[in-house]
C-alpha cells in the first residue's frame, strides 16, 4: 500500500472537494457527509448494531468486492452484513446518542476509504483486505501501526474540515488567525467560541482541536487537560 504524507493527503482532499463543489449548487456552510459520499463515490449508508461493546463504528468494502459477513450475537442469533462497495454500515448508537460530530466523522471516514481505494486500486488490494472496520477513536496513535487507518483519518479531517470553512468561522466568531489558549477553565470565552465553531461545522470538539492544532491555529492546546497550567509537582524535600 502507498505511504502517503499529510501533504499528499491534503492534495487529494483539494481535488476531491473541488469535484464535490462542482457537483453541488448551494453555498457550503459545512460538508454534508451523506450528500458528499453519494456524489463522490456513490456510497450509501445503513445503520446497524455493529458490535456488543461499541468498539466498531463503521464497516465497508471496496467497490469490486461482493461478500457477506456474519456476526454472532450473544442471544445465539447471527447478523449478516452484505457488502458490495456501494454501502457502508454505521453503528446506530452514534445516531441514537445524538453524537453528530462522531457520526459525521465516521460517515466521511467510510467515504475516505472508498476514495483511497479508487485512487490506488492495486495498493488497496480488495482480495488482500476485502472489508474495513472503523474503530471508535478519532485520534491517531504514534508510532503509527496501521497506515490504512491513519491515512484515512487524516484524509477525513481534510475533507470534513477544509481550510476555507475554518478561516470563515474563525473570522465570523472573532477568533482571528489563532486561538492563543484553548482551555475551557482558564479561557472560557474562547472555548465557548471554539465549541460554537465545532457545532457549525458539524464535527466533534476533539476532531476540530486536532485539525486546528495541525494548522498551527492554536497557540497552546489544553483541550485534553484544562488543568495543565496549574499542575504542581512536589519535590523530594516536600515528600520527605
Where do the protein language model's features map onto the residues?
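Active-site hotspot residues in diverse enzymes, especially metal/ion-binding acidic/histidine motifs
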Residues: 1-240
Amino acid at each position: 500500500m502507498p505511504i502517503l504524507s499529510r501533504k499528499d493527503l491534503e492534495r487529494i482532499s483539494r481535488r476531491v472537494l473541488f469535484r464535490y463543489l462542482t457537483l453541488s449548487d448551494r453555498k457550503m456552510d459545512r460538508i454534508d457527509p451523506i450528500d458528499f459520499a453519494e456524489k463522490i463515490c456513490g456510497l450509501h449508508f445503513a445503520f446497524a448494531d455493529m458490535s456488543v461493546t461499541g468498539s466498531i463504528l463503521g464497516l465497508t468494502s471496496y467497490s469490486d468486492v461482493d461478500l457477506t459477513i456474519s456476526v454472532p450475537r450473544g442471544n445465539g442469533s447471527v447478523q449478516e452484513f452484505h457488502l458490495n462497495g456501494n454501502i457502508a454500515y454505521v453503528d446506530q448508537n452514534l445516531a441514537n446518542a445524538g453524537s453528530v460530530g462522531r457520526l459525521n466523522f465516521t460517515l466521511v471516514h467510510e467515504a475516505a476509504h472508498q476514495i483511497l481505494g479508487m485512487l490506488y486500486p492495486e495498493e488497496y488490494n480488495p482480495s488482500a483486505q476485502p472489508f474495513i472496520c472503523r474503530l471508535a477513536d478519532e485520534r491517531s496513535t504514534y508510532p503509527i501501526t496501521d497506515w490504512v487507518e491513519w491515512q484515512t483519518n487524516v484524509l477525513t479531517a481534510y475533507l470534513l474540515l477544509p481550510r476555507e470553512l475554518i478561516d470563515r468561522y474563525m473570522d465570523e466568531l472573532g477568533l482571528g488567525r489563532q486561538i492563543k489558549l484553548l482551555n475551557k477553565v482558564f479561557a472560557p470565552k474562547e472555548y465557548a467560541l471554539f465549541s460554537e465553531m465545532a457545532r457549525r461545522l458539524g464535527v466533534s470538539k476533539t476532531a476540530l482541536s486536532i485539525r486546528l492544532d495541525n494548522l498551527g491555529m492554536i497557540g497552546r492546546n489544553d483541550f485534553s487537560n484544562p488543568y495543565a497550567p496549574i499542575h504542581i509537582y512536589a519535590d523530594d524535600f516536600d515528600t520527605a
